From Swiss-Prot:
The active site is at E250. Its cofactor is Mn(2+). The gene is nleB2. Changing C199S: Mutant used for crystallization; prevents protein precipitation due to irregular intermolecular disulfide bonds. The lineage of its organism: Bacteria, Pseudomonadati, Pseudomonadota, Gammaproteobacteria, Enterobacterales. Protein-arginine N-acetylglucosaminyltransferase effector that catalyzes the transfer of a single N-acetylglucosamine (GlcNAc) to a conserved arginine residue of host target proteins. In contrast to NleB1, not able to disrupt TNF signaling in infected cells. Shows a lower enzymatic activity than NleB1. Belongs to the glycosyltransferase NleB family. It is an enzyme of class 2 (transferase). It is found in: Secreted; Host cell. It comes from the Bacteria. A motif (DXD motif) lies at residues 218-220. It comes from Escherichia coli O145:H28 (strain RM12581). UDP-N-acetyl-alpha-D-glucosamine binds at Q45, W46, F47, Y69, Y216, L217, D218, M219, S319, S324, S325, W326. This is Protein-arginine N-acetylglucosaminyltransferase NleB2. Adopts a GT-A fold and acts as an inverting enzyme that converts the alpha-configuration in the UDP-N-acetyl-alpha-D-glucosamine donor to the beta configuration in the N-linked (GlcNAc) arginine product.
């Protein structure tokens, strides 16, 4: 058994390759280190709120000296030539910009553009009205001294304002143009995992197996070599930000060994049960913590050690040294 408090663990690829059947423990339970193999596809994401800021025939992904995001993706495609590299995109792109995306696919045999509107996420949707109804009913069932009348009246007012055309959690997030838009659909893409590559008519997807896992990387992650075979506790792991003597789970790099990973489904259940749920804090953080039985009694640093995805061939989170490209 591996200790959850470690400096190496599964982020040291050579160590786990020598003992692929090892387990790691957290909160008194052991979890198998499951395989994310060398054929598992890599997914990047670029949701562009202002496509008009690019030149007419330019790929609408930031690519400056300070933020060379497109270069980072094409560099990954060259290094990981045996993996499919997906770019999950959304935005009000022009015909010329979509043509530029198509040219990028032609230039790189293993690169695939995946448009958000082409992917069926309906199995993860819920009516906003149902979310409101559940919370309103819960408030009404409380005794008068514990009922929040102000909240109840506010929820009932907001419920009346939801039209049939707007009665969808997914549709609500699809209209946003902020980080919540980005984060929400990242979570759904990771629920699909490798299957998201089969949601396009592109013939490049024929090598992707149904239900296969996926490796998600933000575009500020720089590959310096092949990732090889990776192992993660129960098949899920993610980047941990370590700055200013604090640690935090980050959604900038996440690996899963299968679609519909139960830790991510736990996060989706939070998104389905709160009117003010946040896709990062609730949809990822709370879901993963709940799945692995993390409680306030546990040491958060130990949990971060347990869940951390780190790799010697990835320079993580380089945009922390610059201003946001958004």
């Amino acid at each position: 058994m591996l200790s959850p408090i470690r400096t190496t663990f599964h982020n040291s690829v050579n160590i786990v390759q020598s003992s692929p059947c090892q387990t790691v423990s957290f909160a008194g339970k052991e979890y198998e280190l499951k395989v994310i193999d060398e054929k598992t596809p890599i997914l990047f994401q670029w949701f562009e709120p202002n496509p008009e800021r690019y030149k007419k025939d330019e790929v609408p992904i930031v690519n400056t000296k300070q933020h060379p995001y497109l270069d980072n993706v094409t560099n990954a495609a060259r290094i990981e030539s045996d993996r499919m590299i997906g770019i999950f995109v959304d935005g009000d792109f022009s015909v010329n910009q979509k043509t530029a995306f198509s040219k990028l696919e032609r230039d790189f045999e293993n690169v695939m553009i995946i448009y958000r509107e082409d992917v069926d996420f309906s199995m993860y949707d819920r009516k906003l009205s149902d979310i409101y109804h559940d919370i309103i009913c819960e408030q009404r069932l409380r005794t008068e001294d514990k009922r929040d009348e102000y909240l109840l009246n506010l929820l009932e007012k907001e419920l009346r304002e939801i039209s049939k055309a707007q009665d969808s959690l997914i549709s609500m997030y699809a209209k946003k143009r902020n980080h919540a838009w980005f984060d929400f659909f990242r979570n759904l893409a990771l629920l699909k995992a490798g299957e998201i590559f089969r949601c396009t008519y592109n013939t490049k997807n024929h090598g992707i197996s149904f239900g296969e896992g996926g490796i998600y990387l933000d575009m500020d992650m720089i590959l310096t070599g092949k990732l090889g075979t990776i192992y993660a506790p129960d098949g899920i792991s993610m980047h941990v930000d370590r700055r200013n003597d604090s640690v935090n789970i980050e959604n900038s790099a996440i690996i899963v060994n299968r679609s519909n990973h139960p830790a991510l489904l736990e996060g989706l259940s939070f998104m389905h049960s709160k009117v003010d749920a946040h896709p990062y804090y609730d949809g990822l953080g709370k879901g993963v913590k709940k799945y692995f039985n993390f409680t306030p009694l546990h040491n958060y640093n130990h949990f971060c050690d347990f869940i951390e995805f780190n790799h010697p061939n990835i320079i993580m989170n380089t945009s922390q040294y610059t201003c946001s490209s958004w």
